[in-house]
Amino acid sequence: MAGQGDCCVKVAVRIRPQLSKEKIEGCHICTSVTPGEPQVLLGKDKAFTYDFVFDLDTWQEQIYSTCVSKLIEGCFEGYNATVLAYGQTGAGKTYTMGTGFDTVTSEEEQGIIPRAIAHLFRGIDERKRRAQEQGVTGPEFKVSAQFLELYNEEILDLFDSTRDPDARHRRSNIKIHEDANGGIYTTGVTSRLINSQEELIQCLKQGALSRTTASTQMNVQSSRSHAIFTIHLCQMRVCAQPDLVNETVTGLPDGTAPTGTEYETLTAKFHFVDLAGSERLKRTGATGERAKEGISINCGLLALGNVISALGDQSKKVVHVPYRDSKLTRLLQDSLGGNSQTIMIACVSPSDRDFMETLNTLKYANRARNIKNKVVVNQDKTSQQISALRAEIARLQMELMEYKAGKRVIGEDGAEGYSDLFRENAMLQKENGALRLRVKAMQEAIDAINNRVTQLMSQEANLLLAKAGDGNEAIGALIQNYIREIEELRTKLLESEAMNESLRRSLSRASARNPYSLGASPAGPAFGGSPASSMEDASEVIRRAKQDLERLKKKEVRQRRKSPEKEAFKKRAKLQQENSEETDENEAEEEEEERDESGCEEEEDEDSGSEESLVDSDSDPEEKEVNFQADLADLTCEIEIKQKLIDELENSQRRLQTLKHQYEEKLILLQNKIRDTQLERDRVLQNLSTMECYTEEKANKIKADYEKRLREMNRDLQKLQAAQKEHARLLKNQSRYERELKKLQTEVAEMKKAKVALMKQMREEQQRRRLVETKRNREIAQLKKEQRRQEFQIRALESQKRQQEIVLRRKTQEVSALRRLAKPMSERVAGRVGLKPPNMDSGAEVSASTTSSEAESGARSVSSIVRQWNRKINHFLGDHPTATVNGARPARKKFQKKGASQSFSKAARLKWQSLERRIIDIVMQRMTIVNLEADMERLIKKREELFLLQEALRRKRERLQAESPEEEKGLQELAEEIEVLAANIDYINDSITDCQATIMQLEETKEELDSTDTSVVISSCSLAEARLLLDNFLKASIDKGLQVAQKEAQIRLLEGRLRQTDMTGSSQNHLLLDALREKAEAHPELQALIYNVQHENGYASTDEEVSEFSEGSFSQSFTMKGSTSHDDFKFKGEPKLSAQMKAVSAECLGPPLDSSTKNITKSLASLVEIKEDGVGFSIRDPYYRDKVSRTVSLPTRGSTFPRQSRGATDTSPLTRRKSYDRGQPIRSTDIGFTPPSSPPTRPRNDRNVFSRLTSNQSQGSALDKSDDSDSSLSEVLRGIITPIGGAKGARTAPLQCVSMAEGHTKPILCLDATDELLFTGSKDRSCKMWNLVTGQEIAALKGHPNNVVSIKYCSHSGLVFSVSSSYVKVWDIRDSAKCIRTLTSSGQVISGDACMATSTRAITSSQGEHQINQMALSPSGTMLYVASGNAVRIWELNRFQPIGKLTGHIGPVMCLTVTQTSNQHDLVVTGSKDHYVKMFQLGDCVTGTIGPTHNFEPPHYDGIECLAIQGDILFSGSRDNGIKKWDLDQQELIQQIPNAHKDWVCALAFVPGRPMLLSACRAGFIKVWNVDNFTPIGEIKGHDSPINAICTNSKHIFTASSDCRVKLWNYVPGLTPCLPRRVLAIKGRATTLP
């Protein structure tokens, strides 16, 4: 590896093979690799050069060995390393890195990380083994691993087993830090200590399977996050000792050598980075979460590209590198420009479909080659110092050795230099080297000459043989060998003679010098040895040389004698040839036997290898088929048993053979011994018989001795005979064992075959299951995508219908108002109109001190009212929208005038013109590239279509050939069509190639433009010129922004016109169907025709009778007149119900309008359209929306109950509350801008429109509807809203009760309201839905397990949420009020009604659940916040999934409220029993557990009961009877009133459209407060029982009490309240905090 210093980032490019899908769709390969060069050609001639390039057919092993293996070796030397995989999605990054463990891969397909792990542990074992062989202390290694995932800019720990896999959106606690040396490290990450390769692979597999993946259109398993797998290697090894001179170190006394073993510690970290693929959303088809992930991935890669550009661009001299723009670049700070050896592997696709992505990837990788890293060894400071000292000692020792050897000398002047001896020695060494080179050359020349001589002599001998007619190739070869041997012997002879001559000369010199040396030097024998021995040695050498010479001469003579004897020579040659052939055959046979033996051994090795592979495959943990596993286990067990038995038989057979040989040898030995003894006995007896001095005693002794020996030998013989019998028996058993062995071997072979077949079957089954699972996953992803698309269409249609409803309602209001304008006004009403001054706003200035003034009263004519109304409208438009639009014009003119007054210098003007031209060129170039990309994508799609058509035609032709091959005409036509399609495809391919070439040319031009960068012009500007250029840029930006705004306004205007046209056509269709319906009552055929038309057009009615409409249908289509609030009650099933709405609207239209009325209506409609188009302001803005609602809303009284065309009996409760008290003041919040009208004077029918519309009820619906036959008792039980007359003394109260809703049997705990609907929840375990227009209960939502403590209605989705016990029930009231889902406090989602079977009240919650105290909806309607226990759970309503928690309270959360900040983020404020109010500010990504942003202090003295927010002001009410006012921006307490009520403050709300606060207490009192100075305005006894909840809509105030009633209140402005002394005293006690 390289030493310390700069090291460039190396870049490798891998081109993946084409996919089968790409081949089927006809994609061409647009990349090519230059052979032998690391160069990629994109298109025709655009070349990119890198460090390594791998083509389509490159194996994984080649990539690893070429790129990564050296980095692993560098880690052992203490160098950091990084491997970075980059490329578009589906380019093969995960496959290259080897982190895709979802599929089984073979060893050849293993990626970089598994191979690097194996290499790492091989290196560890090798170094330990090498140290053991050398007898030194082995190195110690410690390996640890980390696996991080960067998902949506959040760092997740893939090794953290405690992390919830579904909680990916939660904020992690992992932090990134930088040490003193600039190294990057993380805290809060799990680091696992690794002991073996298998353990590390298992950790890698676990982390890889936990990584976020999903399916897109480009890739079935697409990585949705960046993954960084890090291996930390710590090594402690023995330091290498330097070579010492004479084993001493300078400075040590007496030349003692240093003792002890020194160690050094090296650390290294290896990053394996698998980046997520760069994506184009239009190609991946990602929506929802996938789109969000893709955007986050592209942002991280953009930041990485900026870092690479900053590091690699040498011309700009970039000072700042934006590492902190992304967590990805921060983590890779070491790898890019830091202490690491980095290699980047750019994975690209070869298909022309991915041409732009491939081009961008290659450019991206090309920039990375310019990055220089500063690579140093990671060594501890002690080891570094010891290494430096060792190097210094070695240098000094070398210098000392040179002084001692005389190489270095010190001159007279003290300067160091080299000695003359050293220079002479160097010169002689140089000369010696030259001579050696010359000797070597001459030796080679001699060898060549000898070869030539040998060849020539052999040719000569062959010619002689040819002339004699006895030529043979074998004889010629033999002659050549002999001649070569003769020449070699001749050369050796010459060398021996030369050596002999030199020895003779030396011997003569020694003999001549010997007498003198003996007498002169007594020490001569010590140096020269004995003269006699030297003489003997010399004579011996001479004698041997002579013998060799004579032998060589004789051999030469014999060789020469052989040449004339041709016949003898031929015979000997043939004989030698036959001998050589026999020896060759013997050698061949021996080699063949050896090959057979080696082949057998290889087969045995292969069998054993296959058995091992089968055993390994048996242990595969991926198999999950139980039957296969059981069979495989049994089979493996039997094989092992049989194998053991075979081994035992073989061992016993070997032991038997050994015993056999031993017994046979002993038997032979004993037999020989017996025979020798017998012979000796006979010889001795014979000798005794011949002896003359024979004694009987001696004979007996000898005889006894021999008899004893014979008996012993006989005993031994008997033992041996028994052993021989045993041996015979064993031999018999051996044959039986051999038969059993063969049988068992046969069974084992059969079992192995069965095992192989079973394994093959298992693999096929696994492959089939994998394919089925992949197919199902793809189908599920497609269905999910289709569902998202349908949901998007539904939302678009709902939005369109809401807009249609708004326009229709406004049209109806305009018509009704204009009809009322033509009627006379009573004097009383006209006088009340005059009470309000013209410039009176929504009521903010109403207070106790200003209500005493009275305005003059008098009658006004209708024309004066109309003129006043028009003046107010014009004044409003002039103050707000027109000023907003035109406000920029004076400023812009002033700015232009100021700019024109400034004088531009000629140089600044020229620079500005140059910059402007450059900007225009860049813009035009990019537009051209975008257009070319669009053309190329269009051509690719067209080519795919043509390919599909071509394949269909080919299949059709094949089918036609198979069915009727005689139809040549049809086949010819199909062939012609296929040829035409092929020609079209070729033309499209040529066009695609041209587009690619053009894009490449533009890219080169772009690079040229970038090379002459505008920064050069800007950097050459002076300060004044820079200011002028900045001024011009500002003007140009303003102009461009204005142009864009104008274009957007035109687009919105055209879209509005298009919507209006669609609504007009839809209205005409509905009116036509209404007219046909009236005619169809008597014609069944016409009814059927209308029914079919309705179903074809998608707006069929759900009613059983065409002429009647149900109450549910009406409630879904009808909205209160005069309301333009965004929270209006609008339903999504409007296409089916628009006809009913038109029918009602037609009844409200009355007589035709005159021309003046039509003009006014047209002006009002155009006004609304202008506001909706957003040119002046957005109508969705709360301020302008309120203004518009007060400006263009028309009076509602007198038009609430339109006249009827049919008469019937009085069954509606509205007829019983039609009369009003003449003395009661009739007030409206619209009095400031809406011209009032007198009560209707025309006669009414007994049966009004609402009773007619609600007369038809559908059976089986969950809505508890009433019909015409309902009795009065049933109506009372169902619930009704009854009006209340003015009470005595009510003129002094700030609120006036106008209606009362009754119907619950137990205390009402919660309520929610819109302009048309009221929702209430009670202790009777039910919720009720009321129609505020008809005054009736329209539905009862029952089946709750306990008290209903909270209820909310979402106007965006039309869903109702009710809380009871630990459940949140979700009701869909658009069709029939049914519970569609049940949410639990623990975060579970249950489809349908989970509490349906609950017939009795549930006192306790289920195990693991907590009581839910309150809930709140986000203003956008997408989030639901549920307070359960001491936390608030966040639900995403689009998916009905919990995504996070708000924690921080130590007591139960009793109340919460939600608002939106200026950046459209949710701001949640919670109040708890722990007396604290906490604020949570949420961001874009809401995941995990979120802590409070701020704790409001000081806390209350008791638990918090209610909260209310208006703007930046927060009010909190507590059980301590006090109310506090907080500033959300400054996050501090503004004011507090300790005893605002006598009892608990239970509810807070705001007066609609006025800066006034409403508070209600447990004693039943309602108080009104001024929001600005927090002073009381008035109070009223609202209920006799505790008030539990309060809410408002745009007109009314609703209070729910424990007296089972809901009261509807109106605010009464302009009245002086008679405040009690206690209330007035509160003003003095109000505490204002700094």
From Swiss-Prot:
InterPro entries xref list: KIF21A/B_hel_1, KIF21A/B_hel_2, Kinesin-like_fam, Kinesin_motor_CS, Kinesin_motor_dom, Kinesin_motor_dom_sf, P-loop_NTPase, WD40/YVTN_repeat-like_dom_sf
Residues the entry annotates as binding ATP: 87-94
GO cellular component terms, A-Z: cytoplasm; dendrite cytoplasm; glutamatergic synapse; growth cone; kinesin complex; microtubule; postsynaptic endosome
Residue positions, PTM Phosphoserine: 580, 1145, 1163, 1212, 1238
Region of interest: Interaction with TRIM3: 401-1095
GO biological process, one term: microtubule-based movement
Chain positions found as Phosphothreonine: 583, 1234
Keyword vocabulary terms for this entry: ATP-binding, Cell projection, Coiled coil, Cytoplasm, Cytoplasmic vesicle, Cytoskeleton, Microtubule, Motor protein, Nucleotide-binding, Phosphoprotein, Repeat, WD repeat
A family per Pfam: WD40
An annotated Gene Ontology molecular function: ATP hydrolysis activity
Composition bias, Polar residues: 1194-1214
Subunit text: Interacts with TRIM3; the interaction positively affects motility of KIF21B. Interacts with GABARAP and GABA(A) receptor subunits: GABRG2, GABRA1 and GABRA2. May interact with GABA(A) receptor subunits: GABRB2 and GABRB3.
Name of the featured protein: Kinesin-like protein KIF21B
